[in-house]
Protein backbone atom coordinates (compact mmCIF):
# COMPACT_ATOMS: atom_id res chain seq x y z
CA UNK A 1 0.00 0.00 0.00
CA UNK A 2 1.24 3.46 -0.91
CA UNK A 3 2.57 5.53 1.99
CA UNK A 4 0.74 8.87 1.89
CA UNK A 5 1.75 10.02 5.36
CA UNK A 6 4.25 12.56 4.02
CA UNK A 7 1.69 14.13 1.68
CA UNK A 8 -0.25 16.97 3.27
CA UNK A 9 -3.76 17.66 1.98
CA UNK A 10 -5.71 20.69 3.17
CA UNK A 11 -9.45 20.10 2.81
CA UNK A 12 -11.91 22.92 2.27
CA UNK A 13 -14.63 21.93 4.74
CA UNK A 14 -18.01 23.65 4.43
CA UNK A 15 -19.83 21.82 7.19
CA UNK A 16 -21.66 19.72 4.62
CA UNK A 17 -21.64 15.98 4.03
CA UNK A 18 -19.57 16.06 0.83
CA UNK A 19 -16.48 17.79 2.25
CA UNK A 20 -16.84 15.74 5.45
CA UNK A 21 -16.51 12.52 3.44
CA UNK A 22 -13.59 14.00 1.51
CA UNK A 23 -11.70 14.54 4.76
CA UNK A 24 -12.67 11.06 5.99
CA UNK A 25 -11.54 9.27 2.82
CA UNK A 26 -8.21 11.08 2.73
CA UNK A 27 -7.57 10.31 6.40
CA UNK A 28 -8.40 6.63 5.75
CA UNK A 29 -5.94 6.64 2.85
CA UNK A 30 -3.18 7.76 5.21
CA UNK A 31 -2.73 11.37 4.13
CA UNK A 32 -1.68 14.13 6.51
CA UNK A 33 -5.06 15.91 6.53
CA UNK A 34 -5.95 19.40 7.78
CA UNK A 35 -9.48 20.79 7.62
CA UNK A 36 -10.12 24.46 6.86
CA UNK A 37 -13.45 26.27 7.04
CA UNK A 38 -13.73 29.27 4.71
CA UNK A 39 -15.83 32.24 5.77
CA UNK A 40 -16.55 34.22 2.61
CA UNK A 41 -19.52 36.36 3.62
CA UNK A 42 -20.34 38.35 6.75
CA UNK A 43 -23.48 36.61 7.95
CA UNK A 44 -23.98 39.22 10.66
CA UNK A 45 -24.85 41.66 7.88
CA UNK A 46 -28.53 42.63 8.11
CA UNK A 47 -29.21 41.01 4.72
CA UNK A 48 -26.99 37.93 5.04
CA UNK A 49 -28.67 34.66 5.93
CA UNK A 50 -25.75 32.24 5.73
CA UNK A 51 -25.38 29.77 8.58
CA UNK A 52 -21.61 30.08 9.04
CA UNK A 53 -21.65 29.61 12.81
CA UNK A 54 -23.62 26.36 12.67
CA UNK A 55 -21.57 25.14 9.72
CA UNK A 56 -18.32 25.75 11.62
CA UNK A 57 -19.66 23.76 14.58
CA UNK A 58 -20.34 20.86 12.20
CA UNK A 59 -16.78 21.10 10.84
CA UNK A 60 -15.48 20.90 14.41
CA UNK A 61 -17.61 17.82 15.16
CA UNK A 62 -16.49 16.02 11.99
CA UNK A 63 -12.82 16.93 12.47
CA UNK A 64 -12.93 15.62 16.05
CA UNK A 65 -14.59 12.39 14.92
CA UNK A 66 -12.06 11.80 12.13
CA UNK A 67 -9.14 12.97 14.23
CA UNK A 68 -7.74 15.85 12.19
CA UNK A 69 -6.78 19.44 13.09
CA UNK A 70 -8.99 22.19 11.71
CA UNK A 71 -8.84 25.94 11.25
CA UNK A 72 -11.03 28.79 10.07
CA UNK A 73 -9.94 31.39 7.52
CA UNK A 74 -11.70 34.61 6.60
CA UNK A 75 -11.88 35.53 2.90
CA UNK A 76 -14.65 38.13 3.19
CA UNK A 77 -12.53 40.94 1.72
CA UNK A 78 -11.28 38.80 -1.15
CA UNK A 79 -14.81 37.60 -1.84
CA UNK A 80 -16.20 41.13 -1.87
CA UNK A 81 -13.41 42.45 -4.11
CA UNK A 82 -13.17 39.57 -6.56
CA UNK A 83 -16.65 37.99 -6.66
CA UNK A 84 -19.36 40.23 -5.25
CA UNK A 85 -18.33 43.43 -7.07
CA UNK A 86 -18.23 41.40 -10.32
CA UNK A 87 -21.72 40.10 -9.52
CA UNK A 88 -23.07 43.64 -9.07
CA UNK A 89 -21.29 45.01 -12.14
CA UNK A 90 -22.83 42.31 -14.32
CA UNK A 91 -26.33 43.07 -13.05
CA UNK A 92 -25.76 46.78 -13.74
CA UNK A 93 -25.12 45.79 -17.36
CA UNK A 94 -28.43 43.92 -17.51
CA UNK A 95 -26.71 40.53 -17.53
CA UNK A 96 -27.23 37.43 -15.35
CA UNK A 97 -23.88 36.41 -13.82
CA UNK A 98 -22.88 33.09 -12.30
CA UNK A 99 -20.95 33.94 -9.11
CA UNK A 100 -20.14 30.27 -8.38
CA UNK A 101 -17.86 30.07 -11.44
CA UNK A 102 -15.95 33.18 -10.33
CA UNK A 103 -15.89 32.11 -6.67
CA UNK A 104 -14.19 28.84 -7.58
CA UNK A 105 -11.67 30.61 -9.80
CA UNK A 106 -10.82 33.44 -7.39
CA UNK A 107 -11.53 32.13 -3.88
CA UNK A 108 -11.71 28.35 -3.48
CA UNK A 109 -8.90 27.57 -5.91
CA UNK A 110 -6.83 30.75 -5.63
CA UNK A 111 -7.10 32.48 -2.23
CA UNK A 112 -7.69 29.16 -0.46
CA UNK A 113 -4.95 27.39 -2.42
CA UNK A 114 -2.47 30.14 -1.50
CA UNK A 115 -3.49 29.83 2.16
CA UNK A 116 -3.13 26.04 2.06
CA UNK A 117 0.35 26.28 0.55
CA UNK A 118 1.33 28.47 3.51
CA UNK A 119 0.21 25.58 5.73
CA UNK A 120 2.64 23.34 3.87
CA UNK A 121 0.04 21.65 1.68
CA UNK A 122 1.00 19.44 -1.23
CA UNK A 123 -2.63 19.44 -2.38
CA UNK A 124 -5.99 20.92 -1.55
CA UNK A 125 -9.18 18.87 -1.72
CA UNK A 126 -12.83 19.89 -1.95
CA UNK A 127 -16.22 18.20 -2.02
CA UNK A 128 -16.88 19.06 -5.66
CA UNK A 129 -18.32 16.37 -7.90
CA UNK A 130 -15.63 16.16 -10.58
CA UNK A 131 -12.70 13.93 -11.49
CA UNK A 132 -9.12 14.49 -12.59
CA UNK A 133 -6.88 12.44 -14.83
CA UNK A 134 -3.18 13.10 -15.31
CA UNK A 135 -1.41 12.95 -18.66
CA UNK A 136 2.12 11.62 -19.25
CA UNK A 137 3.56 15.00 -18.29
CA UNK A 138 1.66 14.79 -15.00
CA UNK A 139 -0.75 17.62 -15.84
CA UNK A 140 -4.35 17.42 -14.70
CA UNK A 141 -7.35 17.12 -17.02
CA UNK A 142 -10.78 18.04 -15.66
CA UNK A 143 -13.32 15.23 -16.15
CA UNK A 144 -17.01 14.85 -15.35
CA UNK A 145 -18.03 13.14 -12.12
CA UNK A 146 -19.47 9.62 -12.03
CA UNK A 147 -22.69 11.15 -10.66
CA UNK A 148 -23.87 12.96 -13.80
CA UNK A 149 -26.74 14.57 -11.90
CA UNK A 150 -24.31 16.16 -9.42
CA UNK A 151 -21.42 16.86 -11.81
CA UNK A 152 -19.93 20.30 -11.07
CA UNK A 153 -17.39 20.70 -13.85
CA UNK A 154 -19.57 23.55 -15.18
CA UNK A 155 -18.59 25.61 -12.12
CA UNK A 156 -14.92 24.53 -12.29
CA UNK A 157 -14.46 25.40 -15.96
CA UNK A 158 -12.41 28.56 -15.33
CA UNK A 159 -9.69 26.72 -13.42
CA UNK A 160 -6.23 26.28 -14.91
CA UNK A 161 -4.11 23.16 -15.16
CA UNK A 162 -1.66 24.87 -12.76
CA UNK A 163 -4.43 25.09 -10.16
CA UNK A 164 -5.71 21.57 -10.83
CA UNK A 165 -2.21 20.11 -10.52
CA UNK A 166 -2.56 20.91 -6.79
CA UNK A 167 -6.14 19.65 -6.41
CA UNK A 168 -7.91 16.43 -5.42
CA UNK A 169 -11.61 15.64 -5.85
CA UNK A 170 -11.93 12.51 -3.66
CA UNK A 171 -15.70 11.96 -4.10
CA UNK A 172 -15.82 12.39 -7.87
CA UNK A 173 -16.04 8.61 -8.28
CA UNK A 174 -19.11 8.34 -6.01
CA UNK A 175 -22.82 9.04 -6.39
CA UNK A 176 -24.55 11.11 -3.72
CA UNK A 177 -26.31 8.21 -1.92
CA UNK A 178 -22.92 6.51 -1.51
CA UNK A 179 -21.48 9.68 0.04
CA UNK A 180 -24.30 9.84 2.58
CA UNK A 181 -23.94 6.12 3.36
CA UNK A 182 -20.19 6.48 4.00
CA UNK A 183 -20.86 9.42 6.32
CA UNK A 184 -23.58 7.47 8.12
CA UNK A 185 -21.41 4.39 8.63
CA UNK A 186 -18.61 6.57 10.01
CA UNK A 187 -21.00 8.31 12.40
CA UNK A 188 -20.35 11.78 10.99
CA UNK A 189 -22.61 14.54 12.29
CA UNK A 190 -23.27 15.79 8.75
CA UNK A 191 -24.53 12.48 7.33
CA UNK A 192 -28.17 13.61 7.12
CA UNK A 193 -27.51 17.33 6.66
CA UNK A 194 -29.36 18.70 3.64
CA UNK A 195 -27.41 20.15 0.73
CA UNK A 196 -26.92 23.91 0.70
CA UNK A 197 -28.66 25.68 -2.15
CA UNK A 198 -28.53 29.10 -3.70
CA UNK A 199 -25.88 31.80 -3.59
CA UNK A 200 -24.08 32.21 -0.25
CA UNK A 201 -24.84 35.87 0.21
CA UNK A 202 -28.54 35.58 -0.67
CA UNK A 203 -29.28 32.39 1.19
CA UNK A 204 -31.59 29.52 0.48
CA UNK A 205 -34.90 31.36 0.69
CA UNK A 206 -33.64 33.55 -2.13
CA UNK A 207 -35.31 36.90 -1.42
CA UNK A 208 -33.42 37.99 -4.48
CA UNK A 209 -35.20 41.24 -5.32
CA UNK A 210 -34.94 42.54 -1.76
CA UNK A 211 -31.27 41.63 -1.61
CA UNK A 212 -30.34 43.16 -4.95
CA UNK A 213 -32.09 46.48 -4.40
CA UNK A 214 -30.03 46.93 -1.22
CA UNK A 215 -27.00 47.37 -3.47
CA UNK A 216 -28.39 48.53 -6.82
CA UNK A 217 -31.11 51.12 -7.48
CA UNK A 218 -34.04 49.62 -9.38
CA UNK A 219 -35.71 51.54 -12.19
CA UNK A 220 -39.20 50.43 -13.20
CA UNK A 221 -40.22 50.51 -16.85
CA UNK A 222 -42.47 49.13 -19.55
CA UNK A 223 -42.95 45.45 -20.31
CA UNK A 224 -43.90 45.11 -23.97
CA UNK A 225 -44.07 42.87 -27.01
CA UNK A 226 -41.79 43.28 -30.03
CA UNK A 227 -44.74 44.95 -31.77
CA UNK A 228 -44.81 47.69 -29.14
CA UNK A 229 -47.87 46.53 -27.21
CA UNK A 230 -47.45 47.31 -23.51
CA UNK A 231 -48.37 44.27 -21.41
CA UNK A 232 -47.43 45.60 -18.00
CA UNK A 233 -44.53 47.11 -16.07
CA UNK A 234 -41.29 45.63 -14.80
CA UNK A 235 -39.71 46.37 -11.42
CA UNK A 236 -36.18 46.80 -12.84
CA UNK A 237 -34.37 45.00 -15.67
CA UNK A 238 -31.85 43.45 -13.30
CA UNK A 239 -34.54 41.27 -11.74
CA UNK A 240 -35.30 39.38 -14.96
CA UNK A 241 -33.43 36.83 -17.01
CA UNK A 242 -33.93 35.55 -20.55
CA UNK A 243 -36.49 32.73 -20.67
CA UNK A 244 -38.01 33.66 -17.31
CA UNK A 245 -41.70 32.87 -16.90
CA UNK A 246 -42.51 33.38 -13.23
CA UNK A 247 -42.95 36.78 -11.65
CA UNK A 248 -44.04 38.68 -14.75
CA UNK A 249 -47.53 39.34 -13.46
CA UNK A 250 -49.13 38.65 -16.84
CA UNK A 251 -50.95 35.39 -17.40
CA UNK A 252 -51.88 33.73 -20.66
CA UNK A 253 -54.70 35.32 -22.61
CA UNK A 254 -56.76 34.67 -25.70
CA UNK A 255 -57.71 31.31 -27.13
CA UNK A 256 -54.31 29.62 -26.76
CA UNK A 257 -53.77 30.82 -23.16
CA UNK A 258 -50.01 30.33 -23.62
CA UNK A 259 -47.74 31.76 -20.90
CA UNK A 260 -45.47 34.77 -21.39
CA UNK A 261 -41.67 34.66 -21.22
CA UNK A 262 -38.89 37.24 -21.05
CA UNK A 263 -37.37 37.36 -24.54
CA UNK A 264 -35.16 40.45 -24.39
CA UNK A 265 -34.00 43.64 -22.67
CA UNK A 266 -33.21 47.15 -23.92
CA UNK A 267 -30.96 48.72 -21.31
CA UNK A 268 -30.93 52.17 -22.97
CA UNK A 269 -34.73 52.45 -23.18
CA UNK A 270 -35.33 50.42 -20.00
CA UNK A 271 -37.75 48.08 -21.79
CA UNK A 272 -38.36 44.44 -20.91
CA UNK A 273 -39.55 42.48 -23.94
CA UNK A 274 -41.92 39.56 -23.47
CA UNK A 275 -43.31 36.99 -25.88
CA UNK A 276 -45.89 34.23 -25.74
CA UNK A 277 -45.12 30.55 -25.77
CA UNK A 278 -42.25 28.33 -24.69
CA UNK A 279 -41.24 27.92 -28.32
CA UNK A 280 -41.34 31.63 -29.14
CA UNK A 281 -38.85 32.13 -32.01
CA UNK A 282 -37.29 35.11 -30.21
CA UNK A 283 -36.02 32.69 -27.55
CA UNK A 284 -34.04 30.56 -30.01
CA UNK A 285 -30.51 31.35 -31.10
CA UNK A 286 -28.32 29.96 -33.86
CA UNK A 287 -25.04 31.15 -32.32
CA UNK A 288 -23.53 33.25 -29.55
CA UNK A 289 -20.51 35.44 -28.94
CA UNK A 290 -18.47 35.15 -25.75
CA UNK A 291 -15.33 36.60 -24.16
CA UNK A 292 -13.11 35.95 -21.13
CA UNK A 293 -12.16 32.66 -22.76
CA UNK A 294 -10.36 30.23 -20.53
CA UNK A 295 -8.95 26.83 -21.50
CA UNK A 296 -8.17 24.38 -18.72
CA UNK A 297 -5.25 22.97 -20.73
CA UNK A 298 -3.26 25.06 -23.18
CA UNK A 299 -3.59 22.60 -26.05
CA UNK A 300 -3.68 24.10 -29.54
CA UNK A 301 -7.04 23.11 -31.00
CA UNK A 302 -6.82 25.35 -34.04
CA UNK A 303 -9.12 28.27 -34.79
CA UNK A 304 -12.21 26.11 -35.45
CA UNK A 305 -13.27 22.86 -33.83
CA UNK A 306 -16.40 20.87 -32.98
CA UNK A 307 -17.30 19.81 -29.44
CA UNK A 308 -20.27 19.91 -27.09
CA UNK A 309 -21.29 22.70 -24.73
CA UNK A 310 -23.57 23.60 -21.83
CA UNK A 311 -25.07 27.08 -21.44
CA UNK A 312 -26.35 26.50 -17.91
CA UNK A 313 -25.83 24.01 -15.09
CA UNK A 314 -27.45 20.56 -15.48
CA UNK A 315 -28.39 21.25 -19.08
CA UNK A 316 -27.91 18.49 -21.64
CA UNK A 317 -24.87 18.87 -23.88
CA UNK A 318 -25.41 20.60 -27.22
CA UNK A 319 -23.25 20.04 -30.28
CA UNK A 320 -21.39 23.23 -31.26
CA UNK A 321 -18.68 24.52 -33.57
CA UNK A 322 -16.27 26.91 -31.88
CA UNK A 323 -14.69 29.71 -33.94
CA UNK A 324 -11.83 31.49 -32.20
CA UNK A 325 -11.40 35.12 -33.22
CA UNK A 326 -8.00 36.26 -34.46
CA UNK A 327 -7.25 38.09 -31.21
CA UNK A 328 -7.89 34.92 -29.21
CA UNK A 329 -9.95 36.93 -26.72
CA UNK A 330 -13.39 36.31 -28.19
CA UNK A 331 -15.17 33.28 -29.54
CA UNK A 332 -18.21 32.62 -31.70
CA UNK A 333 -20.12 29.45 -30.86
CA UNK A 334 -22.37 28.05 -33.58
CA UNK A 335 -25.04 25.53 -32.52
CA UNK A 336 -25.79 22.30 -34.38
CA UNK A 337 -29.47 22.97 -33.58
CA UNK A 338 -31.09 26.23 -32.39
CA UNK A 339 -30.69 26.68 -28.62
CA UNK A 340 -33.24 28.23 -26.27
CA UNK A 341 -32.86 31.07 -23.75
CA UNK A 342 -29.15 31.78 -24.10
CA UNK A 343 -28.37 34.24 -21.31
CA UNK A 344 -25.63 36.93 -21.41
CA UNK A 345 -23.44 36.78 -18.30
CA UNK A 346 -23.69 33.01 -17.95
CA UNK A 347 -20.84 30.65 -18.80
CA UNK A 348 -20.71 28.58 -21.97
CA UNK A 349 -18.73 25.50 -21.00
CA UNK A 350 -17.03 23.28 -23.58
CA UNK A 351 -16.61 19.49 -23.43
CA UNK A 352 -14.90 16.78 -25.44
CA UNK A 353 -16.65 13.64 -24.26
CA UNK A 354 -16.24 13.65 -20.48
CA UNK A 355 -13.39 16.17 -20.46
CA UNK A 356 -14.17 19.78 -19.60
CA UNK A 357 -12.10 21.89 -22.00
CA UNK A 358 -12.85 25.31 -20.54
CA UNK A 359 -15.38 28.09 -20.79
CA UNK A 360 -16.18 31.67 -21.77
CA UNK A 361 -18.69 34.26 -20.58
CA UNK A 362 -21.64 34.82 -22.94
CA UNK A 363 -21.90 38.36 -24.34
CA UNK A 364 -24.79 38.01 -26.79
CA UNK A 365 -26.98 35.47 -28.58
CA UNK A 366 -28.04 35.73 -32.22
CA UNK A 367 -30.62 34.26 -34.56
CA UNK A 368 -28.85 34.37 -37.90
CA UNK A 369 -27.36 37.90 -37.73
CA UNK A 370 -29.97 39.47 -35.41
CA UNK A 371 -28.94 39.98 -31.79
CA UNK A 372 -31.74 38.47 -29.74
CA UNK A 373 -31.62 40.27 -26.42
CA UNK A 374 -31.81 43.69 -28.07
CA UNK A 375 -34.72 42.53 -30.29
Swiss-Prot record:
Entries under SUPFAM superfamilies matching the protein: Adenine nucleotide alpha hydrolases-like
Keywords associated with the record: ATP-binding, Cytoplasm, Disulfide bond, Nucleotide-binding, RNA-binding, Transferase, tRNA processing, tRNA-binding
Domain of life: Bacteria
Record GO cellular component, one term: cytoplasm
Active-site residues per Swiss-Prot or TrEMBL entry: 103 (nucleophile), 200 (cysteine persulfide intermediate)
Single GO biological process annotation from the record: tRNA wobble position uridine thiolation
Protein localization: Cytoplasm
EC code(s) of this entry: 2.8.1.13
Enzyme class name: transferase
Keyword presence, Membrane: no
Keyword Transferase part of the UniProt annotation: yes
GO molecular function term, any single one: ATP binding
Annotated site residue numbers, Interaction with tRNA: 128, 346
Annotated region (Interaction with tRNA), positions in chain: 150-152, 312-313
Location of region: Interaction with target base in tRNA: 98-100
Matching PANTHER family: MITOCHONDRIAL TRNA-SPECIFIC 2-THIOURIDYLASE 1, TRNA 5-METHYLAMINOMETHYL-2-THIOURIDYLATE -METHYLTRANSFERASE
Family, as annotated: Belongs to the MnmA/TRMU family.
Name of the featured protein: tRNA-specific 2-thiouridylase MnmA
Biological source species: Levilactobacillus brevis (strain ATCC 367 / BCRC 12310 / CIP 105137 / JCM 1170 / LMG 11437 / NCIMB 947 / NCTC 947)
Amino acid sequence: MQDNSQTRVVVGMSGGVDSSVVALRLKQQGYDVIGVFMKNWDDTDENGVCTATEDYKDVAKVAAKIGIPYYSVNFEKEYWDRVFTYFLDEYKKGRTPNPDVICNKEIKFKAFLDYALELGADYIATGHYAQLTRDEAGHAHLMRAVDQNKDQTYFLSQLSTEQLDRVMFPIGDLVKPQVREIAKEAGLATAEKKDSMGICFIGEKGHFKDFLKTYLPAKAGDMMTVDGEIKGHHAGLMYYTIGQRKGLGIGGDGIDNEPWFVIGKDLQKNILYVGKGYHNPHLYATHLSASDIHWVNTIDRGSDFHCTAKFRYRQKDTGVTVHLNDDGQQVTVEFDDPARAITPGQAVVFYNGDECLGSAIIDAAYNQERELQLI
